[in-house]
Amino acid sequence: MQRIGMVANLEKPRVRETALDIINYLESRNVRVLISTRKAAALGCPEKGVAEEEVIAAEGLLALGGDGTLLRAARLVAPAGTPILGINLGHLGFLTEIELTELYPALDKLLAGAYRIEERMMLRGTVQRPEKALTCTALNDIVVTKGAFSRMLRLEVYIDTAYLDTYPADGLIVSSPTGSTAYSLSAGGPLVSPQLQVMILTPICPHTLYTRPLVVPGEQEIRVCVHAPGAEVMLTVDGQQGLHLRDGDVIRVTRARTPARLIRLQDNTFYSLVREKLKEGGSRQDDENPAATVNPETDSKYPHSHPGSTG
């Protein structure tokens, strides 16, 4: 790779320092690092800024932060097919590929082409209104949920043209296999291998005893009709983007045309990640004297503690 894009969550500890060091490390190997004009200015190197379109069109993209940063990156570059390498400076790091301690060997592998691409199904959501249709894409999930002080919703659900049920519930989660380890899991949904092309429909606090999550083939469409006069209803995308819904809105969720493409440098399987990451339950504690990774170019050291955030 000769042109590598970078996105970074600069709100996280150590991200700014790490980003600047990565830039120096890659440039010393004749690799051009592409950063948006806004991010470059925030990093203190405005001369390196380029249009976002150039970042998207890079040969690969580094996502520095946590799982939330990778989710944003996936929505940004998936239509262009740009592969993403997630570098975890967050907390759990279920989606990211490497920890900070593995950074420089991982960059060397990337430049040597010693990696594979793993495709992850994404979701496309459309909110159908008389005046226009609003669209979104998600890697994890598209969620319809009530506001803090709203009564329960009545959500009429169809699979293609077949009526499924009307759910009296606090909301519904439509997740991808990747999102099956996120909000859907917390709401009682199943773990689903990311190799499958399916959607998972998981009700949130249903007001019936028989309602259970449902797995739907990826080639079908899930249609949700909102019946909630006077209630506050929200649609959220990967827990990061939101839209106020109206009574009578129709939400259509299908498999997106293009998948997210994740760079994999290691042999970890989904099943080993489930065992290792979910077993931690987000409760990993920092060591008293955390190990550090060393940049062979600068001898600068970065402790690999894990702050409690997923962005």
Swiss-Prot record:
Residues noted as binding NAD(+) in the record, renumbered to the chain: 67-68, 72, 140-141, 151, 170, 181-186, 240
Principal location listed in the UniProt entry: cytoplasm
Subcellular location: Cytoplasm
Keyword entries, A-Z: ATP-binding, Cytoplasm, Kinase, NAD, NADP, Nucleotide-binding, Transferase
EC number(s) recorded for this UniProt protein: 2.7.1.23
GO cellular component: cytoplasm
Any one GO molecular-function label of the UniProt entry: NAD+ kinase activity
Leading EC class: transferase
Cofactor(s) annotated in UniProt: a divalent metal cation
Active site (UniProt): 67
UniProt entry tagged with the keyword NAD: yes
Region listing for Disordered, in residue ranges: 278-311
Gene3D superfamilies on file: Probable inorganic polyphosphate/atp-NAD kinase, domain 1, Probable inorganic polyphosphate/atp-NAD kinase, domain 2
Reactions accelerated catalytically: NAD(+) + ATP = ADP + NADP(+) + H(+)
Keyword Repeat applies: no
Superkingdom to which the source organism belongs: Bacteria
Positions with biased composition (Basic and acidic residues): 278-287
GO biological process, one term: NADP biosynthetic process
Family under the similarity heading: Belongs to the NAD kinase family.
Described function: Involved in the regulation of the intracellular balance of NAD and NADP, and is a key enzyme in the biosynthesis of NADP. Catalyzes specifically the phosphorylation on 2'-hydroxyl of the adenosine moiety of NAD to yield NADP.
Protein name (Swiss-Prot/TrEMBL): NAD kinase
